[in-house]
Amino acid sequence: MGNNIKVTFNPDKIAAWWPAVGTYYTTTYPQNQSVFQPGIYQTTSLINPKNQQELDSVLINRYKQIDWNTWQGFPVDQKFSLVSRDPPPKPYINQSAQTFEIKPGPIIVPGIRDIPRGLVPPQTPTNRDQGRKPTPPTPPLRDTHPHLTMKNQTFHLQGFVDGLRDLTTTERQHNAYGDPFTTLSPAVPTVSTILSPPSTTGDPALSPEMSPSSLLGLLAGLQVVYFLWTKILTIAQNLDWWWTSLSFPGGIPECTGQNSQFQTCKHLPTSCPPTCNGFRWMYLRRFIIYLLVLLLCLIFLLVLLDWKGFIPVCPLQPTTETTVNCRQCTISAQDMYTPPYCCCLKPTAGNCTCWPIPSSWALGNYLWEWALARFSWLNLLVPLLQWLGGISLIAWFLLIWMIWFWGPALLSILPPFIPIFVLFFLIWVYI
């Protein structure tokens, strides 16, 4: 845009100055016209005039294009409050028109915020203007420390920021580009007028990934893992005690450590120190116990996946089947990754026999059918398994809890009744 221009008009003229972009309006008939308040920031600018006459002619033509009754031709679709409708007081009679001079100012592009410079007071004419030609305009200086000016202009920039916020729209930018008095210049780096609030020292703020609820969940998870680990160690120690007791029906004796290289105190075989000969055997038993626990965990995971239907296995004896053309039966269980799955056989007749894979317990059904094909007596367990399958999950948990706590005590009571239980079971199956 053009540079800011300071102009002093003749006493019989009135000028309204928008200093942010250098827009001027004037008239030679100010008796019934409005006097606009300076400091309104617009998005239009005048090309730097060469002399006072050129400036007056351009401003008068520009002023005549505006219909002050309907506000047609005004550069921005916005009405401003009137300051006064009375003509300004007449200045001193002998005051003559002064020449204008160009002052450096910031380059402003519509839509980009910039910091306006303060108004420069008029300079008194010197002898250089009388005997010599006007001094050529000084090139604009580069503002290398804009933050120093922002510190003192914080309160003055509030109105400027509000004005630019209303002017950075698509319609007003279109009006600015369509104005014949608009000149554009390349954009320059500017300093934002929005000041960030001062930061306070203290505890660092938690990131969104580590909210207080997630932190509490992590701590609770660590406690659960520690609790389970201690329980696993306790279970391994109890199983080790049970395994050792199988070798000593009369009770587990104490290990004195007399035959070892290093004399040790009396201790149990399930808690041998490293200097005892039974230390390596104790850890071998513990290692086997941990492998068995891991195997149980894998079996539990396999059962869970089979229950969800993630293990597609073709059944040995399908319950439902369909016969289709072999050209349509080209997808096997190994080629599909989303249920429902389908198993297909391609006989020589040209037709395919397809049957669906169960959506749940496919592997279990396959293993059960395979066992029934080799052990026919397993059919006797079908009613019992069907009855157990009808028990709710809560009943299973209660049964496991009762066996866990009362099982060892019931072992000494139930052996006499085991034959009776077997007899009742056979009667219930065959009758």
Curated annotation (Swiss-Prot):
Its main location: virion. Residues 2-148 are annotated as: Pre-S1. Isoform M is N-terminally acetylated by host at a ratio of 90%, and N-glycosylated by host at the pre-S2 region. Glycans are attached at N351. The chain crosses the membrane at residues 215-235, 287-307, 380-400, 407-429. Residues 149-207 are annotated as: Pre-S2. The keyword Manganese does not apply. One of its GO terms (cellular component) is virion membrane. InterPro entries: HBV_HBSAG (IPR000349). Keywords: Acetylation, Caveolin-mediated endocytosis of virus by host, Fusion of virus membrane with host endosomal membrane, Fusion of virus membrane with host membrane, Glycoprotein, Host-virus interaction, Lipoprotein, Membrane, Myristate, Transmembrane, Transmembrane helix, Viral attachment to host cell, Viral envelope protein, Viral penetration into host cytoplasm, Virion, Virus endocytosis by host, Virus entry into host cell. It is found in: Virion membrane. One of its GO terms (biological process) is caveolin-mediated endocytosis of virus by host cell. Residues 115-147 are annotated as: Disordered. A lipid is attached at G2 (N-myristoyl glycine). Residues 2-207 are annotated as: Pre-S. The large envelope protein is synthesized with the pre-S region at the cytosolic side of the endoplasmic reticulum and, hence will be within the virion after budding. Therefore the pre-S region is not N-glycosylated. Later a post-translational translocation of N-terminal pre-S and TM1 domains occur in about 50% of proteins at the virion surface. These molecules change their topology by an unknown mechanism, resulting in exposure of pre-S region at virion surface. Belongs to the orthohepadnavirus major surface antigen family. The large envelope protein exists in two topological conformations, one which is termed 'external' or Le-HBsAg and the other 'internal' or Li-HBsAg. In its external conformation the protein attaches the virus to cell receptors and thereby initiating infection. This interaction determines the species specificity and liver tropism. This attachment induces virion internalization predominantly through caveolin-mediated endocytosis. The large envelope protein also assures fusion between virion membrane and endosomal membrane. The middle envelope protein plays an important role in the budding of the virion. It is involved in the induction of budding in a nucleocapsid independent way. In this process the majority of envelope proteins bud to form subviral lipoprotein particles of 22 nm of diameter that do not contain a nucleocapsid. HAMAP family: HBV_HBSAG. This is Large envelope protein. It comes from Woodchuck hepatitis B virus (isolate 8).
